[in-house]
């Protein structure tokens, strides 16, 4: 199949590089699709391939993506980063144009967010109606944030989220950014506690504010967690920053989500972690394996969220009247 043979769909191409690309209506539709009975979803990828390009290793993202494609009738093709040499052996634009000849959707976990932007731009400029989905970059992790939103809806109820608060303790990284965006779109307040030098950049706070949200920033974990309905944390050292491990352990001393810190949260508060978890560092074993932890529910929701997102980028919407 060549680009010329691709039939343009009757909807605009829906790239999702971060959660704000969905907008409020798109987010509502993706979550509704994610909550649908899988067998009720039409096989929108029947006879089609979906490219899964990974520059970084993955457990939850790869498995949830592959199974979501299969559930929608498609064929997932896993591509390791070294096979294409993104922006080294071949430009991101050329990689995107090539993969779009064979696949109806391109999903990529990349080292640099700019690679995704160049892929999406190249397809748009060429008039190729193939969406790009961010499976993780150094800037954002929208697929994780969708699973987080799904988990919060299940725990507290879809109609009871507005006005609740999520406290994020740790490095204000890609996970934090996407969580803050989805929280703003859901009407959930968000606080973040990070050591000096590891807090959110001003542009992230400005984006959250532009979406109608507000993020409270502090360097005191207890201040962030006090009265919060959900407490979220992530590893102190993200993939690709391993050489900073010792420095970060020192900087994040006192930022472990343990029983003492959790006692400051609301009585019905739950604990979230995007995994993998380093017990004894960013979270204690007692908490991550305890009764208030919903991390396995959260992990399971990666599949449901991905299924909803993949269906949405292919033009499927969900509303009171069903699918359309």
Model-derived features: where do they sit?
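Positively charged, low-complexity intrinsically disordered leader regions
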Residues: 1-67
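Phosphate-coordination loops involved in phosphoryl transfer and adenosine-cofactor binding
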Residues: 44-50, 161-164, 268
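Glycine-rich phosphate/diphosphate-binding loop of Rossmann-like nucleotide-binding domains
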Residues: 55-67, 154-233
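A short, gly/pro- and small-residue-rich
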Residues: 115-137, 243-265, 291
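Adenosine-phosphate binding glycine-rich loop
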Residues: 268-269, 274-324
């Amino acid at each position: 199949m060549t680009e010329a043979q691709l039939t343009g769909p009757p909807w605009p191409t829906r790239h999702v590089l971060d959660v704000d690309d969905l907008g409020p209506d798109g987010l509502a539709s993706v979550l509704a699709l994610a909550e649908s009975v899988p067998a009720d979803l039409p096989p929108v990828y029947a006879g089609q391939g979906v490219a899964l390009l990974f520059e970084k290793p993955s457990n939850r993202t790869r498995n949830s993506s592959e199974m979501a494609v299969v559930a929608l009738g498609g064929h997932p093709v896993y591509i390791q980063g070294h096979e294409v040499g993104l922006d080294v052996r071949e430009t991101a634009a050329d990689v995107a144009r090539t993969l779009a000849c064979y696949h109806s959707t391109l999903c990529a976990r990349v080292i640099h967010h700019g690679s995704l932007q160049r892929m999406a731009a190249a397809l748009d400029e060429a008039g190729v109606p193939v969406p790009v989905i961010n499976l993780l970059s150094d800037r954002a992790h929208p697929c994780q944030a969708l699973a987080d939103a799904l988990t919060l809806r299940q725990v507290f109820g879809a109609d009871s989220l507005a006005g609740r608060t999520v406290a994020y303790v740790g490095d204000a990284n890609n996970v934090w950014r996407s969580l803050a965006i989805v929280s703003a779109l859901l009407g959930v307040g968000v606080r973040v506690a990070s050591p000096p030098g590891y807090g959110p950049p001003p542009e992230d706070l400005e984006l959250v504010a532009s979406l109608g949200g507000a993020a409270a920033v502090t360097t005191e974990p207890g201040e962030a967690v006090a009265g919060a309905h959900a407490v979220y944390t992530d590893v102190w050292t993200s993939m690709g920053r391993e050489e900073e491990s010792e420095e970060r352990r020192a900087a994040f001393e006192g930022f472990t989500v343990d029983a003492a810190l959790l006692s400051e949260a609301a009585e019905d508060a739950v604990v979230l972690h995007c995994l993998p978890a380093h017990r004894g560092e960013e979270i204690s074993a007692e908490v991550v394996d305890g009764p208030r932890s919903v991390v396995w529910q959260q992990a399971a929701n990666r599949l449901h969220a991905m299924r909803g997102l993949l269906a949405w980028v292919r033009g499927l919407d969900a509303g009171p009247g069903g699918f359309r």
